[in-house]
Amino acid sequence: MATTTTVDDAQPPTLQNILDQKSLKWIFCGGKGGVGKTTTSCSLAIQLAKVRESVLLISTDPAHNLSDAFGQKFGREAVKVNGFSNLSAMEIDPTSSMQEMIEQSEQRGGALAPFMQDLAFAIPGVDEAMGFAEIMKLVKSMEYSVVVFDTAPTGHTLRFLSFPSVLEKALTKFSSFGKSLGPMFQQFQSMMGGGANAQEDMFAKLEGMRQVITEVNSQFKDETKTTFVCVCIAEFLSLYETERLIQELTQYGIDTHAIVCNQLLYPPPGSQCEHCRVRKAMQDKYVHEMMDLYAEDFNVVKIPLLTEEVRGPEKLSSLSEYLMHPYQPPQ
């Protein structure tokens, strides 16, 4: 029989410990689609900017909602967020880097580029994995004190976190293949009149990315450097996805000890709204389940459903306070 977690047993319902843990370098926010991942990651980045020297917020979700959230256009270059001196943001497509690298090789005279493309994309997930490597290489060169990732919906998030091991294996084979057939490539390249070093450069770049991935992989599995914030709403499917996410993160060896539950209803006392009453009863059921499952080991943060859309730095800053100071429902 499941035991009920008491208030005394429960972890503090805030993300204060993430702000206090100055050794953290990588923070991921993820969960099912439509649960408020972007709002949560933006809010957390705003709070981190109060205690860290420099914060970078990255969207790896193809939908790219950071621009909408802040009301400011972001792209592939890190740009300061309006109103903040030490918070930057960028939106990148993890699938674009491999194709760009092949195109660069072709432009430099790589007659074997079509062959290289077929070979590269024959490795499952390598296009996204190469994008991931490019992202991490870029981010590491920027030297921000902490990086917050606004990830894609759960399935994409888990694949994103598996890229280091996928890419490490793939690039080991790819580099080995390149070294074995390198002389043949050069001879054929000379016959075709192309640049002799194009493929060598490509292999060198792949090898460099493999080294970056190996280092990042070890950092992701270091709880002093990396943590994952699970974002959900009080519904069955979202709770189910959260449990699956936590289990898979545990399998990857990635620390997770925080859950943010968004869009909670708190009708004012005496409210005659039948829809609100029924909806709140359903939410309460899943919140109780969540607390029983996680409150002893996780910081479970409850965020209210607001009456207006959260867009722009001011509203995000206001919402971010709920991550540090528990919301007090009307009595």
Swiss-Prot record:
Any idea which GO molecular function terms this record carries? ATP binding; ATP hydrolysis activity; metal ion binding
Annotated residues for binding of Zn(2+): C273, C276
E.C. designation(s): 3.6.-.-
Q: Which GO terms describe its cellular component?
A: GET complex
Q: Where does ATP bind?
A: K32, G33, G34, V35, G36, K37, T38, T39, E235, N262
Name the top EC class. Answer: hydrolase
Q: What is its main location?
A: cytoplasm
For this UniProt record, the keywords arranged alphabetically read as follows:
ATP-binding, Cytoplasm, Endoplasmic reticulum, Hydrolase, Metal-binding, Nucleotide-binding, Transport, Zinc
Asked whether the keyword Transcription regulation is assigned, the reply is no
Query: Which CDD domains does the entry link to?
Result: ArsA (cd02035)
Outline the subunit composition. Homodimer.
What protein am I looking at? ATPase GET3
Annotated source species: Malassezia globosa (strain ATCC MYA-4612 / CBS 7966) (Dandruff-associated fungus)
Question: According to the entry, what is the taxonomic lineage of the organism?
Answer: Eukaryota, Fungi, Dikarya, Basidiomycota, Ustilaginomycotina
